[in-house]
Amino acid sequence: MLQTGDAIQNARDSAPRTRKSSTASVSATIISMPEHVITEDFGRPAPSLPSRAQSDYTGAGWRGGRNYEQGSSSTHQPGVTAASESWTMVLNSKEVKNAKPDEDTRSQRSVGGRSVASIRTTSEFAGNDSSPNFKSQLFAKDSQISVLKTKLSEVERKFEKRSQDYYEMKAEKEMLEKRVENQKVSSHEMDSLQELKLARQKAQDQKEKAVEECNMHKRKIVGLEEEIRAMVEQLRLAKFNLNENKKEFDEYKNKAQKILTAKEKLVESLKSEQGIGSSDRPVHLLQAEVEEIRVERDLTKADLESAQLQVYTLRSDMEELEAQIRDLQSQLSDQKRTHLEEKQTWDSTIGLLNEKVECSRIENEFTKQEMKRQGDQHQSKMLEKENELRKTISDLRSRMRDEQTKQEDDGSSQLTDLLLQKQQQLEDVLRNNQVLNVRLERLQKATNRETSIAVDSNSSPMHTSSSHPLLSNINNPQTRNALHTVDSTAFKLLSMLRGHPSARLFFVLYFIIMHLWLFFIVLTYTPEIH
């Protein structure tokens, strides 16, 4: 049994090479053809056309007859009609109807519930019908098949491109979901920022308590210093009194010594006079005078002993006062040292908390700016993608309309359905992207509302947005308007700095110059010594 390709080759060798016209009319009975045919070349639904056998049969003629194809391009549509009529004639011929099952025929195949009529391509049929019109019609149909092939490949490339865009949009969707998760993480960081703020507030309260305790201890220290000054004054008075008493005692001692010497001289003179003129004065008078002198001497000794005892007591009191003063001074120095250490620890703790709060605020601002920048970039990308998709959809629609007007085959309907399905998928992706954009904007607004908190260093409020709850707690409209004006002015200034690089450069230079000037003043400042 001959193969189909051999039969077509024999028909090609026996058929003449001349072509007269591509618009020859062939009388045939038109029969109904199936809408979709699975060809061997494509493997997908296509118009009801001969597959590889007819392509092999007409390939050489098509390669040698491009000039004929260009010459008959103006009558391409009638040639297509004539080709369809010629194939109807072939299907209605007696050789096809009377073909036996064991001959070289293509059996009927079921494609989607439809059957394709088998045709006989043997040498007998080629010998009976080998007119040039039939060849020209085959050439026209082959050209139409090649055009459809190119269009189908182009549509497949577009479909692959749309699929790639779809996967890219899906990846962007996943990226947006990850960004939403990152925003949730940033909200957790904001919770930690709130905790740091509460810890800073507690530290400030503890600092205030420590300052109050320090003031109380300072008052105690002042009282102790006053007591020390009073004791020092008492000690000075005691020393002065002791010196005065010493002077008086020395004077009294000198006087007593003089009196005693005078008395002794008097006694000696009396004794000498007693031996000379004992008869002149009585003895009892002399004895009375001696006793009187002895009594005075005893009184003087008693006064001297009492003065010495007073001096000893004053010395002991002075030593006790000095010991008390030393104890008070040591206690005062210990209290001062402990208070200074506590103050240094509180200052270091508050400085660390302030640094943490400032770092958190800077990170929050940077995160907000980064999110805004990414949102703007994503918005611009989404707009570009939407414009490209709209343009592509419009191009596809226009081409689909052109193809629908140009093509009369039923195979284009399936491609149209496929393109419409892809268009619907693209529209769904666009709607999903719009929904994601709306969610992103809402999340950004919510994040802006949550992150605009007042972090004040040394009781100075931070920048607050117009949606901050502090503004809603202010009942005075003038104060609220003033705060809103300051907030909007700061926001405009920041937006101007963000949009103008020269303004940012000027601000940075101004910032550096001001800090250098401040450091110069701090380093060269010498306080006046009065």
Curated annotation (Swiss-Prot):
Topological category with respect to the lipid bilayer: Single-pass type IV membrane protein
Keyword field: Coiled coil, Golgi apparatus, Membrane, Transmembrane, Transmembrane helix
InterPro entries noted in UniProt: Golgin_subfamily_A_member_5
GO biological process, one term: retrograde transport, vesicle recycling within Golgi
Cited Pfam families: Golgin_A5
Disordered: annotated span: 1-26, 41-116, 368-388, 453-477
Residue runs in coiled coils: 163-446
GO molecular function, one term: protein homodimerization activity
Cytoplasmic topological intervals: 1-504
Compartments where found: Golgi apparatus membrane
Lumenal side: 526-530
Keyword Transmembrane (UniProt): yes
Cellular component annotations (GO), alphabetically ordered: Golgi apparatus; Golgi cisterna; Golgi membrane
Compositionally biased spans, kind Low complexity: 457-472
Compositionally biased tracts (Basic and acidic residues): 94-107
Polar residues bias: start-end ranges: 69-91
Protein name: Golgin-84
Biological source species: Caenorhabditis elegans
Organism taxonomic ancestry: Eukaryota, Metazoa, Ecdysozoa, Nematoda, Chromadorea
